[in-house]
Every structure is written in C-alpha cells, then in structure tokens.
Regions:
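Acidic, low-complexity, intrinsically disordered interaction modules
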Residues: 39-94
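N-terminal functional modules and adjacent low-complexity/disordered segments of proteins
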Residues: 7, 15-16, 56-57, 66, ...
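Amphipathic alpha-helices that form helix-helix packing interfaces
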Residues: 17-20, 24-27, 31-34, 67-70, ...
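Exposed acidic/polar residues on beta-strands and adjacent loops within beta-sheet cores, strongest
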Residues: 4, 59, 108-109
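N-terminal acidic leader/helix
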Residues: 2-41, 45-48, 52-53, 103-105
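Low-complexity intrinsically disordered segments
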Residues: 86-110
Length: 110
C-alpha cells in the first residue's frame, strides 16, 4: 500500500487510543461471550433452534448497544488523523484503500 508521506505515521493521544481499544474490547469480548454461551460443543455444531437463538442474541446485542454507531465513532477518530489530500486517482489514501474492500450485499436470489 502506497500512502501519502503525511499519512505514513498518524498520532493518537493516549486517551483516544484507550477509548478506541475500550470500544473494540467491549464489542469483541461481548460477541465472543455470546458465541461461547450458545456454541458449547467443541465441534461447533448446534441445533437450528440454538443457532436461531444465537443469531437473535447477536442481533439484539448489536442493536441495543449501538455497535454500528460505536464503530463509526472509532472510524471517525482514526480517519480525522489522516491527510485527505487527493492523489492521482482523485482519491485520498483512505478512499483508495476502502475501495478495495468487499462489503456485504443482499444475496441475488432474494
């Protein structure tokens, strides 16, 4: 990945870094705990009923705890540290890298 020279090193304050790590830790450990609660068999196999309960619990956790909002806030704190100078492709470094991402899309057969 080729970055604008200004973006080769970004700086966060200690408070910002702790806030970001706290958000990530809350989400990551909570999701792990939900999975461990429902997936108790070492093989990872569960009944459809348990899988449905796991999916419902995960969705409720995401919704009730504003996970998308929390992640958006983290993204904003990190993104604001970057220079948004446009490169030759008329995109900044973040846009150029995010363009490579493959995002979830609605399945074609629905």
């Amino acid at each position: 990945m080729k970055l604008n020279k200004e973006n080769e090193r970004i700086v966060l304050s200690g408070h910002e870094a702790i806030d970001i790590l706290s958000e990530i830790e809350f989400i990551l450990i909570s999701l792990r705990n939900i999975a461990r609660h429902y997936y108790t068999d070492a093989s990872g196999e569960v009944s459809q009923k348990v899988r449905s309960a796991y999916c419902e619990e995960t969705t409720q956790f995401i919704d009730k705890n504003n996970v998308t909002g929390r992640l958006s806030k983290v993204r904003g704190v990190i993104s604001e540290r970057f220079s948004h100078e446009l490169g030759m492709e008329n995109m900044d470094d973040i846009e150029r890298e995010m363009e490579k991402m493959i995002y979830w899309e609605k399945p074609v057969d629905e």
